[in-house]
Amino acid sequence: MTNTPAPKSSYSRRWAWDGRAPLRGFFNAALRLIFRVTTRFEVIGREHVPATEGFIVMINHIHALDPLVVIPSLGRSVTPMPKVEAFESLAIRFFIINYGCIPVHRGDVDTQAIRLATDTLKSGGAVLIAPEGTRSKTGGLIAGQEGMAFIATRADALILPVAIQGTPDVFPALKRLRRARVTLTLGEAFRMDTGGGRASRAMLQHLTDDAMRRMAALLPESMRGVYK
């Protein structure tokens, strides 16, 4: 993370932290139906989802569908954190605002996004973060960035690792009139330990790597990437 403040977006972010997500329930129901019909969908380890406490949903990122598969599937309301560039698409902007998302400026310290995510977690909500910061081109894990660890330690939040498999196969399978197998494997929720002090950047990276290794343990070896 750099120390350069992120420029303010002209788009409203209020929906993510004040509870104004008018179509979240509708979108979740629609997404569940779509994936039930178009894929062979399975969630393993649903018992690991925290019942009431705020938590971070940590995902590996292998396809644009990843957040859409995860957010309706955990039995808890989850706030995604998409890149702010997604607002440039009118349709995606409609979804982001009405679902209730926290847009993030990538590459800089986005203090507003950090504050909104922290507030959401402290109020008992859940946010979805891909610590890799971008999609993996190979399907294997790439090095995690410390932004998730910064938010997790600031909010003292639980982290639920969710390993995604199969999303890149969805559209190719549909073209052949088949349904791809899509699997979410949930690990045990954990909390990052800073030893009671403020985490340095080196410690944040260490905590990030530890979290990514937990993610790797939920994936087949071929998808563990730099965390084999």
Regions of interest found by a model, annotated:
Residues 39, 107-110, 141:
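A conditional alpha-helix N-cap/helix-loop micro-motif detector
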Residues 36-44, 165-168:
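Short gly/ser/thr-rich secondary-structure transition/capping motifs
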Residues 46, 60, 83, 107, ...:
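Generic beta-structure capping elements
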Residues 28-29, 36, 49-108, 116:
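Catalytic core of membrane glycerolipid acyltransferases/transacylases, capturing the structured
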Residues 43, 80, 101-103, 159-161, ...:
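Conserved beta-strand scaffold positions in the cores of enzyme catalytic domains, especially
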Residues 47-50, 176-177:
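A short beta-turn/loop motif at secondary-structure boundaries
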Residues 2-23, 112-228:
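Non-catalytic C-terminal accessory region of glycerolipid acyltransferases
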